[in-house]
């Protein structure tokens, strides 16, 4: 990897970590800017480097570095009720990064879908399927679509594709 790529990967690890701290509690799954930076990482860095940046974020958190929401970290967060969302982040980043041009909106939404599906199924192990959907998916649909669309617009501006 070139120095610029290493720097960009590190930047998105940091941005995602900061985004996790901008949080509003609305149940067991907090509303944060993590999803925004997860999608933006894929759009700006592409699927491979985006995946790497968010995988590093997940690994740092699993190792106990307080990068998750509420300045938390540790393997318990990966194994706990919201762990599925965290596990899904690198996959969503990869999918979002596959998009170019107008397809970016679609791949960003597909990335969100992956986060929802994995997170919902994981959370359902703790609270049941219906309650997991009500707590862990439904309240996030509109805010996350707005975040994903904003990420696409910002990525296009950063890359000069207006």
UniProtKB/Swiss-Prot annotation:
Function: Probable biotin transporter.
Coiled coil: none
Compartments, record wording: Cell membrane
Matches recorded under PANTHER family: BIOTIN TRANSPORTER BIOY
Family in the record: Belongs to the BioY family.
Organism taxonomic ancestry: Archaea, Methanobacteriati, Methanobacteriota, Thermococci, Thermococcales
TM ranges: 6-26, 59-79, 81-101, 109-129, 134-154
Pfam family, one: BioY
Name of encoding gene: bioY
One Gene Ontology term of the molecular function aspect: biotin transmembrane transporter activity
UniProt name for this protein: Probable biotin transporter BioY
The keyword Ligase belongs to this UniProt entry's keyword annotation: no
NAD in keyword set: no
Keywords: Cell membrane, Membrane, Transmembrane, Transmembrane helix, Transport
InterPro entries (alphabetical): BioY
Membrane-topology annotation of the record: Multi-pass membrane protein
Main location: membrane
GO cellular component, one term: plasma membrane
Domain of life: Archaea
